[in-house]
């Protein structure tokens, strides 16, 4: 009988750790509740080690633990979202674990999922808001989308790990506009939360300068973009 000698079953349990690691401090923080998908919404995929067998389920709720699986070595993954779909409120959670299916046995699998893309938020200081009539910030991960944070945007965006460029568009009260790239995040990794903060202050010469920070190295020594620099000379 086909199911009696060469097949087993899998009992899977999926959990999700919604904590992200802010690069401005050492303690992890929980992601916004509204962005925390229920594990029942996570999709499942089972792939044999030799690639000869692959099966997917749209959700954990669709998976029947009585499903007969050919004996062999597998990797089972659970995921929510898509690494290639970037944007606001687009977290991508992923977890995977190896599992051995044995004849007429029920193998238990526990999969813990964590954020597999990068969380980015943008904040503007009150001084910054008063100085400029309009402003926006656009981030771009290598090979990914261009995501614009308008002046009123408060949501988090999620992008692929890797290099992330930061572009800022500013409009002064007198109508003069300028666009420049004040900084880049060279190697953002999965599960990190970058809080990009933009501020404006006066330097020792009494000239307005922009300050941008996004990690522990620029938190106390922000990158300064002076009005005298080429990219912002019009400001």
What are these regions (language model features)?
Residues 33-58, 64:
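N-terminal, post-signal-peptide region of Sec/Tat-exported proteins
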Residues 1-43, 68, 75-91, 96-103, ...:
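Extracytoplasmic cysteine-anchoring/structural motifs
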């Amino acid at each position: 009988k086909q199911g009696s000698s060469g097949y087993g079953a899998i009992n899977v349990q999926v959990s999700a750790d919604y904590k992200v690691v802010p690069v401005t401090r050492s303690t992890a923080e929980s992601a916004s509740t509204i962005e925390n998908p229920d594990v029942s919404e996570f999709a499942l995929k089972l792939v044999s080690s030799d690639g000869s067998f692959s099966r997917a389920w749209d959700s954990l709720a669709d998976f029947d633990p009585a499903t007969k699986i050919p004996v062999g070595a597998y990797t089972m993954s659970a995921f929510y979202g898509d690494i290639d779909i970037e944007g606001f409120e687009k977290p991508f959670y992923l977890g995977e674990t190896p599992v051995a299916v044995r004849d007429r046995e029920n193998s238990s699998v526990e999969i813990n999922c964590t954020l597999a893309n990068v969380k980015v938020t943008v904040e503007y200081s009150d001084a910054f808001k008063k100085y400029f009539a309009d402003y926006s910030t656009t981030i771009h991960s290598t090979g990914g989308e261009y995501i614009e944070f308008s002046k009123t945007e408060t949501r988090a965006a999620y992008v692929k790990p890797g290099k992330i460029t930061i572009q800022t568009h500013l409009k002064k009260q007198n109508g003069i506009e300028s666009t420049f790239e004040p900084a880049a995040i060279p190697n953002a990794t999965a599960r990190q939360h970058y809080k990009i903060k933009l501020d404006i202050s006066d330097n020792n010469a009494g000239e307005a300068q922009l300050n941008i920070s996004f990690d522990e190295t620029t938190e106390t020594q922000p990158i300064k973009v002076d009005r005298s620099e080429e990219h912002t000379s019009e400001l």
